[in-house]
Amino acid sequence: MGNIHIQTKSKEYDVHVGKEALSHLTMIVQNMQPAVSNVMIISDEAVASLHLQTVIDALQVEQDVFSFVVPSGEKEKSFENFYAAHTSALENKLDRNSLILALGGGMIGDLAGFVAASFMRGIRFVQVPTTLLAHDSAVGGKVAINHPLGKNMIGAFHQPEAVVYHTPFLQSLPKKEWRSGYAEVIKHALIGDVELYHWLKEEVQTLADLRDEKLIHILTKAIPVKANVVSQDETEKGVRAHLNFGHTLGHALEKELGYGNITHGDGVAVGMLFAIFLSEQVYKVNLAYEDMKQWFLKYGYPKMPRDLNVERLVQLMKQDKKANAGAIHMVLMQEYGVVNVVSISDETVHIALEAFQKDMV
């Protein structure tokens, strides 16, 4: 069992990680001041069928507990479900002392968090992540829904009261979701914990190694990387953008291929490889791109699709939240553990993407 303390300018809270983390949930709710009036659990159909009753049973409180369940999938992080959640909250008489509990992966955490941020101008919420990917999204307070023209374009910064990372919930994940979440673990290692990066290369030979004590070790090492960045820059005015390493191309791939047709982590993995590929050219350094590519492929991460239109990807990358005055800004790597946000011309990105696409045969 491991506890990680998160400190930001707006709030302090704990991340409870381990096989018995769910046992903390009742005390977390009971200790809140002012007292919680009622609880609304937001989940998706897949997670609810597996874990909703377990959480309700663990939540031994006197307050009324309601649930709002949406279909599964990234495309459900929509305005329609956001609006429907508000309707459910009003129908169940939630008020400013109510608590929203986000039970699910990153999609649910984002959706439920944004509902909490906006309902009556902001009420409290707790994250109960059920995926490895959510070790990233559940911490830091970024909550959002998607717009047809871009991912996470409508949202807010709203920190949770706590994060309860009950690792047994992860055991039901399909292989593609383990791989997706592991990409964000790799990202945290590359940008902020080089020792963790070397440990991963030695200790995680296959995705099946992401279990038991190794899993808890990974979570208690990767989450503090994000916590450290968020403590310095809660609202992404500076160094927090470093957490977007791999995301400029990754988000473009998700948008171009269609949400749900490529997992977030697979997109980020391709994006990280491209960022390393481009970083070697921009900084004139050797980042062992070829070794990194083989390491990623060993885990089953996809190659850059050969049939995608490069110019279309460039235009999508210009819609990224880091873009400024229509110019692409990417997180590039000077060396392992040292990254910077860099403005890159469309032409440079286009040429590099074409070369990267050909290299990923």
From Swiss-Prot:
Q: Which residues bind Zn(2+)?
A: 184, 247, 264
What EC class is this? Answer: lyase
* Gene3D superfamilies in the record: 3.40.50.1970, Dehydroquinate synthase-like - alpha domain
Q: What is the superkingdom listed in this entry's lineage?
A: Bacteria
GO CC, one annotated term: cytoplasm
Q: Name one GO biological process term.
A: amino acid biosynthetic process
Q: Which SUPFAM superfamilies match?
A: Dehydroquinate synthase-like (SSF56796)
* E.C. numbers: 4.2.3.4
Q: Answer whether the UniProt record assigns the keyword Mitochondrion to this protein.
A: no
Q: Which family does it belong to?
A: Belongs to the sugar phosphate cyclases superfamily. Dehydroquinate synthase family.
**What does the function comment of this entry state?**
Catalyzes the conversion of 3-deoxy-D-arabino-heptulosonate 7-phosphate (DAHP) to dehydroquinate (DHQ).
* Record-given protein name: 3-dehydroquinate synthase
